[in-house]
Amino acid sequence: MFKNTFQSGFLSILYSIGSKPLQIWDKKVRNGHIKRITDNDIQSLVLEIEGTNVSTTYITCPADPKKTLGIKLPFLVMIIKNLKKYFTFEVQVLDDKNVRRRFRASNYQSTTRVKPFICTMPMRLDDGWNQIQFNLLDFTRRAYGTNYIETLRVQIHANCRIRRVYFSDRLYSEDELPAEFKLYLPVQNKAKQ
């Protein structure tokens, strides 16, 4: 999808405020929902994915199962709200041995397991909104001893709220981020005593 696109800086694949946030995504829902709601903490539209079973309610990009993203930027960043329920996401990458590998992170696992085509790992989320930064270059090298070439697919499962999902060429400090990539929390007016 993005193979022939010049890639530098930031490349967003989901923005909850956009007119069609799931334009390039496919949805699967069983015993749950995927809908856009206003989150009270940030007073803004977000995408909520909820389901009784994490494996049967998810969004996947690209929508066409025969297509791949072709994103070469090595950092995946997701702005996600912890709903204090089971949550998992998966990223499929291509390495320099021309092997498709999957990384699956979830908040209900306690150990990392590396198998030839999939690496599953635990993920700890703080209360409220989190910025998940995933260094695909480093994970591919550490898990498989190979070099990351590109990201083929991203799949985000229940249960979470999503503000944005993007790729970047490096990790950026809060000051360096473009305004629309920051998560603004409303300023609390504290009464003077």
UniProtKB/Swiss-Prot annotation:
Q: What GO cellular component entries does it have?
A: axonemal B tubule inner sheath; axonemal microtubule; centriole; ciliary basal body; cilium; extracellular exosome; motile cilium; nucleoplasm
Q: Which UniProt keywords apply?
A: Cell projection, Cilium, Cytoplasm, Cytoskeleton, Flagellum, Microtubule, Nucleus
Supply the Pfam families for this chain. CFA20_dom
Main subcellular localization, coarse class? nucleus
Compartments, record wording: Nucleus; Cytoplasm, Cytoskeleton, Microtubule organizing center, Centrosome, Centriole; Cytoplasm, Cytoskeleton, Cilium basal body; Cytoplasm, Cytoskeleton, Cilium axoneme
One GO biological process this protein is involved in is:
positive regulation of cell motility
Q: Which GO terms describe its molecular function?
A: RNA binding
Q: Which residues form a coiled coil?
A: none
The record ties this protein, via PANTHER family, to: ORF PROTEIN
Summarize the protein's role: Cilium- and flagellum-specific protein that plays a role in axonemal structure organization and motility. Microtubule inner protein (MIP) part of the dynein-decorated doublet microtubules (DMTs) in cilia axoneme, which is required for motile cilia beating. Involved in the regulation of the size and morphology of cilia. Required for axonemal microtubules polyglutamylation.
Describe, as the record does, how this protein assembles with itself and its partners.
Answer: Microtubule inner protein component of sperm flagellar doublet microtubules.
Spell out the family assignment given in the record's similarity comment.
Answer: Belongs to the CFAP20 family.
Quote the protein name from its UniProt record: Cilia- and flagella-associated protein 20
